[in-house]
Amino acid sequence: MLTGLVVTPDKNDVNTDTINALKTIKQVPPGTYSVLKTNIIGKWFINEQNLVFHRQPFSTLVCQNEVQQSSLMNYLIDETSTLSTMRSYLENAVKKRVCTTERPIACLLSGGLDSSLICALVAKEVRETQGKQIETYCIGLEGSDDLKYAREVASHLNTLHYEIVVTEKDFLSAIPEVIRKIESYDTTTVRASVGNYLVSKYISENSSAKVIFNGDGADELMGGYLYFHKAEDPIEFDKECRRLLSHIHFFDVLRSDKSIASCGLEARTPFLD
């Protein structure tokens, strides 16, 4: 894999774009494809790029004519209908992932809203369809709020809960290996990947679970980061959500997928349906 930052062999320039580490190498975004052809001397070139395989319609309800175009705006600002639709979509996103795997399931649980919602839905679905408890895992420093609140959520959901207590030294020591696993030097991505990698390593070594649910994507989708409170208006809020989602495969999804997959596990992110 190409993971260097230096352009070769002609120029010794560092690329400041953390999305594409090499200036002469371009990534093909997920869900797209490029068409390569040869010229008259047999040299390959990109004829078409970033062609989309499939794109989900804005609203399946609108596409199914269940909502008339004239009443679309009323539908969008109807809080009750919006919340009901969001809940239905999230429940279906969890259900289809639970029902299409025969491998043991576990959930990453930080005690926050996003992971707790996913854990609750997964626990309910597994209990109703398989009659089993799910395993939940939380990682954190001794005395951290994550451990405390995850413990409370796990108790409420009646899960088989495990805590991985680590030290600051454990986190720092894991950074070189994490960089190799996720193939990224992006500071925020690396920092956020360490916990994912360590908890996944623990699961891989101590559990039969192979399919790992998490709450990734909710902050980008719902504007969950603290700086969203500074948005000037709903339009700017929405623009920032769309910007984050358009690049999420370079950062949060990359972190979630590679740090978990590097331990032989499969990540599931229902919020990103």
Describe these PLM feature segments:
Residues V94, V98, V178-L272:
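Conserved glycine-rich, hydrophobic/aromatic-active-site segments
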Residues M1-S184:
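Cysteine-centered catalytic environments shared across enzyme families
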Residues D146, F171, G195-N196, D273:
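Amphipathic coiled-coil/heptad-repeat helices and related helical stalk/stem segments
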